[in-house]
Amino acid sequence: MPDRTEKHSTMPDSPVDVKTQSRLTPPAMPPPPTTQGAPRTSSFTPTTLTNGTSHSPTALNGAPSPPNGFSNGPSSSSSSSLANQQLPPACGARQLSKLKRFLTTLQQFGNDISPEIGERVRTLVLGLVNSTLTIEEFHSKLQEATNFPLRPFVIPFLKANLPLLQRELLHCARLAKQNPAQYLAQHEQLLLDASTTSPVDSSELLLDVNENGKRRTPDRTKENGFDREPLHSEHPSKRPCTISPGQRYSPNNGLSYQPNGLPHPTPPPPQHYRLDDMAIAHHYRDSYRHPSHRDLRDRNRPMGLHGTRQEEMIDHRLTDREWAEEWKHLDHLLNCIMDMVEKTRRSLTVLRRCQEADREELNYWIRRYSDAEDLKKGGSSSSSHSRQQSPVNPDPVALDAHREFLHRPASGYVPEEIWKKAEEAVNEVKRQAMTELQKAVSEAERKAHDMITTERAKMERTVAEAKRQAAEDALAVINQQEDSSESCWNCGRKASETCSGCNTARYCGSFCQHKDWEKHHHICGQTLQAPQQGDTPAVSSSVTPSSGAGSPMDTPPAATPRSTTPGTPSTIETTPR
């Protein structure tokens, strides 16, 4: 009894209170350990929760620090020196157990979201224990992976207790003659084994982010829920989860305390509300749930400090309600999808039936039209046949009406009419394309013909000019040869022989004389025609024409002599041979 009377005069979670709890609390859920010195506050900034409350900075191993609104003195030191404080062996074991439960809960929470996120969380946890990640990096990467921010007490808790786990890992690795990374890779189940530790509810570690659509773990409410209510009714000083941040401000409860013993500051007016704060909107669940959160809180109010711990235990059931809300939203979404599928199926059925009805009506009127044509051609037999198929007697007036109906465009959905219009449109496009193609081809042919005509005229002019120039050049050469007595009359080179018939033409050899004989024989020997009738001219053997061309005397003189007539006989006689 002296312990109980002393508890009313001490601070919350004082060493005396913690010693009392250590005797009553089972090993699965240990209370916060005792502190060995003055309260130490961390440098962690208080963070406003989603329901509008704030957590004040936590101290080492659950010792209370003055809240932000009630502190009269400054804080002592930063959280960097928390890991250097010596702890008793029993307290260290409890802190290691809490830290392992915390890491196991994080890993299982990631697995509940998805296997990929669970694997990423496991990698982050191993990196944190292996000292490859700092606590701040672990906090940011975990929030990025799960999209859930951790509660403000987590970083000071890790800074205070992670060195204990790392020292234990280093000690075990030295005993196994391995480095810590190898030992942790081989004995990972000792750190993240859910069967050896009792994991806490993930809602105690993570802030409420209902609007981002993340799910909560639905399968751990009984571990921290009403299954332990008889135990807590017998021992109200026991705490169901020593690292739970589930305390939330309530207007009916006044000042509440964090699970590690730190009182909350006076909160601002709430801006966000939990689902339990709006219990009136969820009457559909009250019939099969336990007594409401507000009733149990009013019942436990006379208990003082421990009533807040009972409220903390009740807060664990919030995940069940949120899980029900998620299922409700999912069920509503599935119902909407089913309604859309059903409406789409009905619409398709109606369209198919309309199409079939239109096709049957079209076939019916086609048969009526064919029967009417047969009636005109075949007579009474066709008339009786059409009367059997048609409910209306095929009189001439009705036939005219049916014919007009057939030629009138149908107002409903007629596949044949649509197909006919599509074919006509395609044919029209083809005709236009062919017309354009023919125009393009004819234009190209016309341009090519004009180009060919122009080029041909240019070519003809060029050829005519070349011929004229060649003729002028030939005449100039001939005239130059006739004027010169020293050049060959055929090729223009230096002449060495003279024609024996006229002693005028000069040649460079017998070849040129034979070549020029066709032109030269018309004028050769005209001046010596009278004297040459009596005697045969003596022709040099070197310049005798070929037999095929005939002798100069055998060839009759031309009627028209060349423009340059040889000189007089006296001149010819005097010309040296």
From Swiss-Prot:
Region Important for oligomerization: start-end pairs: 310-356
Q: Which GO terms describe its cellular component?
A: nucleus; transcription repressor complex
Which UniProt keywords are listed? DNA-binding, Metal-binding, Nucleus, Phosphoprotein, Repressor, Transcription, Transcription regulation, Zinc, Zinc-finger
Q: Which residues bind Zn(2+) 2?
A: 499, 502, 520, 524
Q: Where is this region: Nervy homology region 3 (NHR3)?
A: 416-465
Q: Where is this region: Nervy homology region 2 (NHR2)?
A: 310-356
GO MF assignments: identical protein binding; transcription corepressor activity; zinc ion binding
**Zinc finger (MYND-type) residue numbers:** 488-524
Compositionally biased spans, kind Basic and acidic residues: 1-10, 211-237
SMART domains hit by this protein: TAFH
Q: Which Pfam families match?
A: NHR2 (PF08788), TAFH (PF07531), zf-MYND (PF01753)
Q: Which PROSITE patterns match?
A: TAFH, ZF_MYND_1, ZF_MYND_2
**Annotated region Disordered: where?**
1-87, 203-271, 374-396, 529-577
Q: Where in the cell is it found?
A: Nucleus
Binding residue positions for Zn(2+) 1: 488, 491, 508, 512
Please report the stretch or stretches of sequence annotated as the TAFH domain.
93-188
- List where Low complexity composition bias occurs: 68-87, 380-390, 536-553, 560-577
Positions of modified residues (Phosphoserine): 14, 390
Compositionally biased residues, Pro residues: 262-271
Q: Which GO terms describe its biological process?
A: DNA-templated transcription; fat cell differentiation; negative regulation of DNA-templated transcription; negative regulation of fat cell differentiation; negative regulation of neuron projection development; regulation of DNA-templated transcription
What is annotated about its quaternary structure and interactions? Homotetramer. Heterotetramer with CBFA2T2 and CBFA2T3. Interacts with TCF12, SIN3A, HDAC1, HDAC2, HDAC3, NCOR1 and NCOR2. Interacts with ATN1 (via its N-terminus); the interaction enhances the transcriptional repression.
Which family does the similarity line name?
Belongs to the CBFA2T family.
Its domain description in UniProt is: The TAFH domain mediates interaction with transcription regulators. Nervy homology region 2 (NHR2) mediates homo- and possibly heterotypic oligomerization by forming a four-helix bundle tetrameric structure.
Purpose: Transcriptional corepressor which facilitates transcriptional repression via its association with DNA-binding transcription factors and recruitment of other corepressors and histone-modifying enzymes. Can repress the expression of MMP7 in a ZBTB33-dependent manner. Can repress transactivation mediated by TCF12. Acts as a negative regulator of adipogenesis.
What's the protein name?
Protein CBFA2T1
